[in-house]
C-alpha cells in the first residue's frame, strides 16, 4: 500500500514496553525474556488523517475529545455534574464486587483459568440484564452461534433483547456497535480480536493493546458498558501486556478449582468501588448459582466436636465470614 512503511519492534509481554532492539531484560518492568518481535506499521500523514476520521469511515472524528482543533482546557467548575449511573447485573454477588452494580461507560475485564466459568457467568449476566430491559450485544470470537445457543439452552432462555454476534474484526465490531448502540457489550475474548491496522497475529501484545484502547474510547464516548474476557497465563495473571490491566476500569478474577463446584469472584482493581469484596458462586448443571451465605460453604463437611479445629470470623469487605482453622498437634518424646 502506498504511503505505508513496515518495520518491526520489540514489545514486552508483561508491561507493553516498546524497544527498537531486543534486550534480555525489559528496561521498564525488569522482566527477563519477555521481549517479543512484532511488525508495526507507520502510516504517512495522508493515511493518518484518513484514520482520524473514524473507524467507520465517516468524517466525524472518533476520539475522546472530538476534533482536536476545537479542544480547550476547562476548569472543573465548568464541567456538568452528572450522577453516577449504575445498573444491576442480575447477580447480587457480582453487583457487590463491582461496588453496587455496573457503571455506565465502564470497561470491566474478567480473568480466570480456562474452564472456570468466565463465559458462563457473562452469558447468564447478559440474560439477566436483557430480561430487565437492558439492550445487550454478546460478541464471541471463540464459539459459533450454534455453540452459544446450546449453552444458553442449558442455563435458560435468552430474551430477544439479547443479540449475538460472532466476529473478531475490530473495524466491523466498532461499526456494528455504533449503529446498534447497545447499552452493554460483552467481548469473549479480547485475545481473539484483531485490528487491520496492526500487522500481527490476534492475541499479540500490539493487537491486545490496540483493541483495548479502541474499546476504551468507545466506552467513554458512547457510555456503553463493556465486559471483556481475558485469558490468564500460567502465573495466574491476564495474558498480554500488563498495560491492559492499567487501561480498564475494573479487573475481576474468577478463581477456584475447575473440578470443584464453588467459584470465588475477586476484584483486584476497581475505579468505582472497593477491591475488598468477594462474590461466591456454585457451578451447577443449570449454570452458576449465587451463594448468599459463604460461611456455610467454608464450614461444610466440618465434623462437630473434633480436636485441633477452631472457627474464626474474618471480614471480607463488608461481609463477615466464618472460616475453619486447623492445627495438628502430636505428643513428642521431649516431654
Model regions and ranges:
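The Walker A/P-loop phosphate-binding site
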Residues: 56-155, 174
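Substrate-engagement module of ASCE P-loop NTPases
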Residues: 206-227, 231, 247-258
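Short cysteine-rich clusters marking metal-coordination/redox-active sites
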Residues: 12-15, 26-29
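Flexible beta-alpha connector loops of hexameric P-loop NTPases
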Residues: 83-84, 111, 159-167, 195-209
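Short metal-coordination and nucleic-acid-contact micro-motifs, chiefly zinc-binding Cys/His arrays
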Residues: 6-8, 22
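Loop/turn-to-beta-strand initiation segments
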Residues: 135, 161, 181-184, 222-227
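Short glycine-rich substrate-engagement loop in P-loop NTPases that contacts/grips substrate
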Residues: 91, 152-179
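Conserved P-loop NTPase
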Residues: 27-31, 35, 41-76, 80, ...
Amino acid at each position: 500500500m502506498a504511503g505505508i512503511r513496515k518495520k518491526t519492534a520489540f514489545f514486552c509481554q508483561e508491561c507493553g514496553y516498546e524497544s527498537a532492539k531486543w534486550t534480555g531484560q525489559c528496561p521498564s518492568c525488569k522482566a527477563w525474556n519477555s521481549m517479543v518481535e512484532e511488525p508495526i506499521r507507520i502510516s504517512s500523514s495522508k493515511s493518518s488523517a484518513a484514520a482520524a476520521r473514524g473507524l467507520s469511515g465517516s468524517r466525524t472524528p472518533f476520539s475522546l475529545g472530538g476534533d482536536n482543533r476545537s479542544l480547550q482546557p476547562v476548569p472543573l467548575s465548568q464541567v456538568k455534574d452528572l450522577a453516577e449511573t449504575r445498573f444491576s447485573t442480575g447477580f447480587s454477588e457480582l453487583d457487590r464486587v463491582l461496588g453496587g452494580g455496573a457503571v455506565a461507560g465502564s470497561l470491566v475485564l474478567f480473568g480466570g483459568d480456562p474452564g472456570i466459568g468466565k463465559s458462563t457467568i457473562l452469558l447468564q449476566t447478559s440474560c439477566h440484564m436483557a430480561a430487565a430491559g437492558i439492550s445487550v450485544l454478546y460478541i464471541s470470537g471463540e464459539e459459533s452461534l450454534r455453540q452459544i445457543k446450546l449453552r444458553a439452552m442449558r442455563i435458560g432462555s435468552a430474551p430477544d433483547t439479547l443479540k449475538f454476534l460472532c466476529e473478531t474484526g475490530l473495524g466491523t465490531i466498532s461499526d456494528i456497535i455504533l449503529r446498534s448502540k447497545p447499552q452493554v457489550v460483552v467481548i469473549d475474548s479480547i485475545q481473539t480480536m484483531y485490528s487491520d491496522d496492526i500487522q500481527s497475529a490476534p492475541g499479540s501484545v500490539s493487537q491486545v493493546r490496540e483493541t483495548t484502547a479502541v474499546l476504551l474510547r468507545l466506552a467513554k464516548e458512547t457510555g456503553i458498558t463493556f465486559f471483556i474476557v481475558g485469558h490468564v497465563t500460567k502465573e495466574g495473571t491476564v495474558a498480554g501486556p500488563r498495560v491492559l490491566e492499567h487501561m480498564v476500569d475494573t479487573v475481576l478474577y474468577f478463581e477456584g478449582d475447575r473440578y470443584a463446584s464453588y467459584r470465588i469472584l475477586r476484584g483486584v482493581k476497581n475505579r468505582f468501588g472497593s477491591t475488598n469484596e468477594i462474590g461466591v458462586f456454585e457451578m451447577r448443571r443449570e449454570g452458576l448459582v449465587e451463594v448468599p451465605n459463604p460461611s456455610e460453604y467454608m464450614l461444610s463437611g466440618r465434623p462437630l466436636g473434633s480436636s485441633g479445629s477452631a472457627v474464626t470470623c474474618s471480614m471480607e469487605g463488608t461481609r463477615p465470614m466464618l472460616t475453619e482453622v486447623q492445627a495438628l498437634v502430636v505428643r513428642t518424646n521431649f516431654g
